[in-house]
């Protein structure tokens, strides 16, 4: 017989100290003592990242500039969200660039220079650029590297690939939506 330990409402779920004052995260979970609340970056229950726990980062990844238009000035917008936060700036840039060319085409109504953009042949799953042959989706025009395609589309065996595109979540039948590019 296995024993089940019932966690009381005054028990910290991170260090298991009992009869302590618990702090509430932005997500609404009341689960950590003061020491764990200051130490643990995300909510232990749902992994939600509270806004006040976003720490400034000194590293901002190099993002290629778009050839035919200029993106929104991220510095002005991030100062309003969180002062001195280059991490918020980095997240905002990655969100815009991570959407890929189809998102930017819809946002800016621009199709010129699409193939010359730096992210044109980046895998939408692992976000790395490879010199290998990329596979292009016919549904959402996103690219997959060989490793991600083999892992995602043949995970359950060649007879049962994923029933949806992992980038746009549209349903499809088999491998007919991907083509070598």
From Swiss-Prot:
Transmembrane segments: none annotated. It holds the Pfam family zf-C3HC4_3. A zinc finger (RING-type) spans 12-47, 123-169. Gene3D superfamilies: Zinc/RING finger domain, C3HC4 (zinc finger) (3.30.40.10). It comes from the Viruses. GO terms for molecular function: zinc ion binding. Keywords: Metal-binding, Repeat, Zinc, Zinc-finger. This is Putative RING finger protein ORF97. It comes from Ostreid herpesvirus 1 (isolate France) (OsHV-1).
């Amino acid at each position: 017989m296995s024993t089940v330990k019932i966690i009381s409402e005054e028990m910290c779920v991170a260090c298991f100290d009992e009869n302590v004052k618990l702090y509430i995260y932005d997500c609404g979970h009341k689960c950590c003592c003061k020491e764990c609340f200051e130490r643990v970056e995300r909510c232990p229950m749902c992994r939600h990242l509270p806004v006040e726990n976003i720490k400034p980062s000194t590293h901002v990844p190099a993002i290629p500039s778009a050839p035919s238009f200029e993106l929104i000035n991220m510095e002005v917008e991030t100062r309003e969200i969180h002062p001195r936060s280059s991490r918020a700036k980095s997240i905002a840039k990655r969100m815009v660039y991570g959407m890929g060319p189809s998102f930017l085409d819809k946002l800016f109504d621009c199709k010129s220079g699409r193939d010359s953009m730096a992210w044109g042949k980046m895998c939408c799953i692992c976000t790395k650029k490879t010199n290998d042959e990329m596979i292009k989706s016919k549904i959402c025009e996103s690219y997959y590297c060989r490793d991600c395609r083999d892992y995602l589309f043949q995970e359950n065996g060649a007879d049962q690939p994923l029933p949806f595109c992992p980038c746009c979540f549209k349903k499809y039948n088999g491998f007919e939506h991907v083509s070598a590019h």
